[in-house]
């Protein structure tokens, strides 16, 4: 399958290094954007959760790639994702996959932030889902690992988790912050 450019909701290409909100492609009942949130009694917002309301955009992320420093993002670009702003209590705002108690969840931080869990090495990709939406997938570095869709665990706080192939993925679109609201680094 040929790699295609990834587009934002206004039809512009999505670029490495720019800021975007990742929000549900399903208007209304689908919920809103994503942000770090507290789960499992942790004091620090380490898990990545989806806002309940579609009026809430969550917090913007920035995509980077170990392969190149700038340019357009394609459906085969290996990505790192990080929130533009980091909670003070976390080591990093970079997205990671943490395996603990049988679940692989999407979180932020480094290994010090997740003493109970195991961080899975790998990278994220954006894949097309229908004509206008996308899904995020995670591809482990281990040769045996094939990529898994990122979905939502609706029990509790709508946390983002790796899904097995038969579950439905989190359908997303990318929204550029309105100019003026974007924080210049």
Curated annotation (Swiss-Prot):
Belongs to the protease inhibitor I3 (leguminous Kunitz-type inhibitor) family. This is Kunitz-type serine protease inhibitor DrTI. Keywords: Disulfide bond, Protease inhibitor, Secreted, Serine protease inhibitor. It is found in: Secreted. The keyword Secreted applies. One of its GO terms (molecular function) is serine-type endopeptidase inhibitor activity. GO terms for cellular component: extracellular region. It comes from the Eukaryota. The record marks 68-69 as: Reactive bond. Disulfide bonds join 44-89, 139-147. Inhibits bovine trypsin and human plasma kallikrein. InterPro entries: Kunitz_inhibitor_STI-like_sf, Prot_inh_Kunz-lg. It holds the Pfam family Kunitz_legume.
């Amino acid at each position: 399958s040929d790699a295609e450019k990834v587009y934002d909701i206004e039809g512009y290409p999505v670029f490495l290094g720019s800021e975007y909100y990742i929000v549900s492609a399903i208007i209304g009942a689908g919920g809103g954007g994503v942000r770090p949130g507290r789960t499992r009694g942790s004091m620090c917002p380490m898990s990545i959760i989806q806002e309940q309301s579609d009026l809430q955009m969550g917090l913007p992320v920035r995509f980077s790639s170990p392969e190149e420093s700038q340019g357009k993002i394609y459906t085969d670009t290996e990505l790192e994702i990080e929130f533009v702003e980091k909670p003070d209590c976390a080591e990093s705002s970079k997205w990671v996959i943490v395996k603990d108690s049988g679940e692989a969840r999407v979180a932020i931080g480094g290994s010090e932030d997740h003493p109970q869990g195991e961080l899975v090495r790998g990278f994220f990709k954006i894949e097309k889902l229908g004509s206008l939406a996308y899904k995020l997938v995670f591809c482990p570095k281990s040769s045996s690992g094939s990529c898994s869709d990122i979905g939502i665990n609706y029990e509790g706080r709508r946390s983002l988790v790796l899904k097995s192939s038969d579950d439905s993925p989190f359908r997303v679109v990318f929204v550029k912050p309105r100019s003026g609201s974007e924080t210049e680094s």
